[in-house]
Amino acid sequence: SYLKAMDHFNEHLAAKGIVYARSMYNIQQIVTPKEGRLQVELDCIRPDVQVRYTMDGSVPTAQSPLYTKPLMLTEAKTIKAATFAGNEQLGQMLELPVIWNKATAKPVKSAGTGDLYMLTNGIRGSQKYTDLEWCSWMKSDTVTFTLDLKKPELVNKLTLGSITNYGMAVHKPAE
């Protein structure tokens, strides 16, 4: 198959001391609010690897639990996961700190501003706009949304992150 041929080719590159991208073994995540909980989906583009994970702070090993279905969270956790073939770790370890606060996993109501689940999924966006944890709008957009906390709550602080990535024409709000 193609993947086995690529693995064989990569072995030749490694034997010659040529560094090649191993990102095909890295894990991508999607965290979405579901009925007051967070659903954490882990995936690798390589179907021939095993995803192993921990939620106790330890580094995953080939003996860690095998990821077979989405994880459901009801509190703050740090998920660590990596891909394995046998006992060998192949990609970088994913370390995913999931934050829990009054808004986590609560519904976001909006009028035409797109899918805003990232506002309450417990994940802070990284410095990479491409991590899919950012909402984006154009300068001409009017953005309104409501976080439904389900009951009256005293809110002392509201934190909303923003990012600047000039190379991708992503800029912080002007106002």
Give, region by region, the residue ranges found by the protein language model:
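Short, compositionally stereotyped local motifs that mark structural "simplifiers"
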Residues: 3-144, 163-166
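Extracellular and analogous surface-interaction loops
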Residues: 144-156
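A short beta-strand element within beta-rich, extracytoplasmic domains
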Residues: 153-167
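Short coil-to-beta strand junction motifs in C2/discoidin
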Residues: 168-175
